[in-house]
Structure formats: C-alpha cells, structure tokens
Amino acid sequence: MNFTELSSSVRPEIIRATQAMGYTEMTEIQQKAIPLMLAGHDMIAKAPTGTGKTVAFGIPILSKVDPASLKPQAVILSPTRELAQQIAQDLQNLAQFLPDIKIVCVYGGAGLDKQQRQLKAGCQIVVATPGRLMDHYRHHAIDVSHVETIVLDEADEMLNMGFYKDVKQIIDTMKNRKSLSMFSATISREVMDIGWMYQKDAEEITVQPKEESQPKITQYMLETSGRNKLSDLAQIIIGECYKRVMVFCDTKFNTATLANQLARLGFSVDCLHGDLSQKERNQIMQNFRDGRLAILVATDVAARGIDVSDVDAVINYDVPGDNEHYTHRIGRTGRAKKEGVSYLFYVPEEKKRVQELLRLTRNTDLCTPVHFDFNHEHIVVEKKQDSADRFQIKCYF
C-alpha cells in the first residue's frame, strides 16, 4: 500500500513529507495502525523494533492536531532520552511542510527552565520521558487539558524500567483523552494492566518480522576467557578494519573499564552509560555519528533508542541476560538493506545460554570466524601519523 492512498484522510503536506523522506510503500504496522488511529480507536500494537512505528503513530497525530491551537493535543511517552529525541526528530521530518506545527521534546538530564519556556511558548505535540513530564506537570509548566491522543512507545521497556506509577499518573491527569495507543515489542503483564485500566475496546495488532525483511546479520559466537577477551576484541576490530563499531557491556562499570582499556591501546573510543549528563551523551553520540569516534561502548539501557546508520559491527562483550536485549543489540548493524555482522563473547560456563540465543535467532551452530587465528600474544601498539586512519594504531600479534 502506497502512502499516496492515504490522501483522502491525511494532510497533503504529510504525504509530501513522506515522499521527501524517500518513503513509498507502507510497512505492515503502518498499514494496520494508521487507519485505526485516524478513526480514534484505542490500540495495542505488538511489533518488533525497526518496523516503522514512529511513522505509524506520527501520521495520524499530525493529521488530527489543530495547528491554530498552541495547546498540547498529543503526548508521546518514551522510556529513554535518546528514543524521545529520535521520535521528536522523526516527527519534525514528517511535519517539515507544516510550519505551524510545534513539537517539544522533554527529558531528564537537561535543564528544566529551557524546557518550561518551550512548553509555555506553545506546541501541539509533546514527546517526553515519563519522569520529566511529571516534573513539568507538578511545576504547572504544561497544560494537559486539551490532550486527546496518548501514545506509549516501547511500552514494555518503559513499564519494565520502573515508570509504571508515572505512566498511570500521566494518563490520569489527561481527563479529555480520546485515544490511548501502545506500541510494544512484547505484551507484558504491565502492558496488559494499563490496557485493562485505561483502554476501551482496544484493537490489537500483531506484526511478525518477515524472514525476507530481516536484516542480513552474520553472527559469530566466540568462546574466550577473561585473560584473552580484550586481545580477541582488538584483533577482530583491527583485522576487519571496522570504522564504526558498537560494543555492549552489562554494567556501567564494565562499560567504563573497557572503554579505558581500548583507549590505552590507542583506539578512538568513548562510552555511554546512565551516569553521564545529557550534554555529555549528546556530544558522544554526535562524535560517533560524525566518525570522530570509531568505537562506542554502551550499556543496553543507555543505548536504547539510538539510531546510527552504517554500524559495521556489533560486539557483545558480555552475554546479555535478556533475549530482547540481544536482538536489540545486533539490530544496530545490518540496517538500510546492508549486511551486518555481530560477535558474542562467552566463557564455557555460558555455552547453554548462548545456545538459547542461537535458537532465538534461528542459528544452528556455534561458529568462530575462520579468518582469525587467535594466538593471544601480547599486543604492541604504535601511533600512526595518517590522520585518515580512524583507529590511529598499528598492532602486532
């Protein structure tokens, strides 16, 4: 189904924006969700990441808000700052030919005063993390009396992160709401509870990832040890000449430690975790997107919602305890119909867990890259003068 087929119910400026963004055919979630939201139905949509959910709820919201009113009419809740920023940017792109539409994004880690000024200046759409939205509500910085549409994006993750109480309070404050839509990778007990309490005759949508639409990601499972782990990581990155790599660790401590170790080896690296200020996080992400950083080491929560194209490889330095975290991690590579590669490091005691992940991703074998000969000799690093070499190192094994 083509976006132009929505012309009878969607503003022409939005159709024009989809064309400018290079969109032609709608994804399955967009075909199913857009008509329901345009009709004002409550909805629970189960769909994996990367299926076009932002456009699925963005088009109906932009079509229904009144540009003449600068009162918030739609609120979109996101579990993380990065995802909130990404949603707001996507909505701005969809609204690029609607100059009267104002979108404000509010999240923790940034100053309240600036966000309050933006809210008081007026907008039709607010994208927010739950805690920060409640902060503004308590400070009387936002008028929610005109909000008719509420969207919970990544609802399962948001409620699992401890925002259940905040989400309930937010919905309770919006007395004039007409529709509540939840988009979620899984339908957890908490998601169902919110549905039972606040939705009426909700439409349910399930979108399964199609085999042919899944990214082509070659997955390597590497048995290693604590003593050899760093050496193995360095050999992979150098041997493959990767220019943009994401490395995932389980904890903030491991993330910072690994980033320091890689930096001492001469790699262009930084880390992303929950203890950083929003300004620091934004700068790190900008450096990574612009190519000034070759390696980004991150925790799962800190990396949630990050959208970076052309990630050459994802390396799971620690085995994730959650299946969803693994699929979200490796989904950072192999985007835009490009082939990707991921590596999972594990110790012998974790082999059973790795086999579970293999079944999850329909892999059948534990495989190590045949093009590497891990001899675990000491790494010697030399600085190179060639500024075009982003790693700035030379290694001998």
Per-region residue spans from a language model:
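Conserved helicase RecA-like core
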Residues: N2-K383
